[in-house]
Amino acid sequence: MKERELRDLIAEVKTGRLSRRAFVQRMIAVGLTAPMVGMMLAQSGVPMQAAEIPYKPTKAGGGGHLKILYWQAVTLLNPHFAVGTKDQDGARIFYEPLAGWDAEGNLVPVLAAEIPSKENNGLTEDGLSVVWKLKQGVKWHDGKPFTADDVVFNWEYARTPETAAVSIASYKDIKVEKIDDFTVSVKFAKPTPFWADAFVGTYGMIIPKHLFADYIGGKSRDAPNNLKPVGTGPYVFDDFKPGDIARGKINPNYHLPNRPYFDSIEIKGGGDAVSAARAVLQTGEYDYGWNMQVEDEILQKLEASGKGKVLITETGNIEFIMLNSTDPTVEVDGERSSIKTKHPLFSDPAVRQAINVLIDRASMEKFIYGRTANATPNFLNAPEKVRSKNNKFEFNIERANSILEAAGWKKGSDGIRAKDGKQLKFVYQTSINAPRQKCQAIVKQACQKAGIDVELKSVVASVFFSSDTANPDTYTHFYCDAQMYNTTMVQPDAGFFMNQYVSWQAATKENKWQGRNVSRWQSKEYDDIFKQAEQELDAVKRSAMYIKLNDLVVADNYIQPLLRRPKVAATAANLRVPVSGWDNDLWMISAWYRET
């Protein structure tokens, strides 16, 4: 679609000749996501129109106890340190952002009084600033007022390198100023097409200045409230046992009328995905089960009982294998997997290329995941307009053998290939989960036929995805040769998702392994294109840049995409849950209720 045609359509929306819904549908047809269309319209002077969240209760409380099951247990409750989805969701019960993303990709105000637009003077033509007006009368759980000072503090807290916040990328390149007690200005150093990053969604949850001001920087991990949250959310902290359970009780002073419905809430951790699915769909012991990474055949049988249902929500999430670009066995200055080292096996491109064609993605989809995943050769899969058409996956054991043979990796008497005195054997880890162990087995079996010895390692999910920086078995430490997990796309723009491979995001001891580039893979070309994409206002050019970034990552084979995975949750038949593929599962926990 040409720029002139696009501008004409936007003009028709402004005058009312074309409905907003019809415009969104046209843009989705050419590859844009609904959230990106909403941002485009807002920048053009057409405010976002979030649909009202369905909510029937006429008073707060009275709903009893809400039981949520996360088979990966919550380990901390500070959103700025939450490297895993389960810790992000745990924090979302107590903390809130200025706005969240609904299912249609519209911004929904939470702590904001309204969504910035040109009509309310919140957005500028040049894309260099945004003005947020805050909701008045909101109180922290300890009774202190929520003000612009808290918003400015969160910017200072997250952007300080010594704080080692996983959210630093959203805050380090902006400037936030207090205009008055309930208004803040966010200023960008360069034109920014996707302005709804800081203070929005997953990395937008706001913590109170009066409790964290003394813990900015190097003392950040010492704050008592890292484990005892005092937020603005619908539930007040009650109890927390890291790695086990988090409990909350109704906030009697919540800033939305008639909410929340439930008197108390718990997120119980532990077990596995199958037992979690059974506890919701079959026995009804729990109301909601997160991340049903279970064979689809099992889910369908459990769902047939009628006590619950499976919710499938499309996302940009990707299950993938990551090959370590560094050496996990060598310690440099007290740090393993240091960016100063190279992996002894994977530094050979032929080895990475061979592994790529030894992965039977089609079988993983067909025999394990079914309707809950789709095989893909791309790391970046959403929105459709940035999904590369340049790649395809292949399963070919014969080709893998030929690649290795040509590169000088010869089979020994034990059947394992070797070169320059190094055997082709490595350790491949993931979290304990039946589908993941089956995927591991598929890869191991194929590798054996190519003369590669693969040792499988499984780590308890609550440990593997822990945000504890002292835990050496987390996926962010990556003290292993290869690992597999699912990374989530927590906003509709590709920028934050693709910063997982910029050099300045490498996970290191210095940043307490909070950097998003866990593989430590580095490319100057990638860095340069990423910087260009950050400030490119032309949507078509920007999309082409993200496709190029995807292709660079995929071509180097340190990253092996496997499956596009939607969100899959289990819920009680009478539980009403606003879902969104662009935000966390608990993004609108205040609106959950039971149909009676």
Summary of predicted features, one role per range:
Residues 69-124, 156, 230-232:
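N-terminal lobe/hinge region of extracytoplasmic solute-binding protein
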Residues 39-71:
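C-terminal segment of N-terminal export signals and the immediately downstream linker at the start
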Residues 167-216, 239:
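Surface-exposed binding/hinge segments that line
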Residues 72-91, 111, 166, 195-205, ...:
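A structural "hinge/loop" feature
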Residues 562:
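Active-site-proximal polar cores
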Residues 67, 108, 129-131, 183-185, ...:
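General beta-strand recognition
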Residues 22-49:
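N-terminal export signals
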Residues 2-18, 22, 26, 51-61, ...:
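Extracytoplasmic/periplasmic ligand-capture domains
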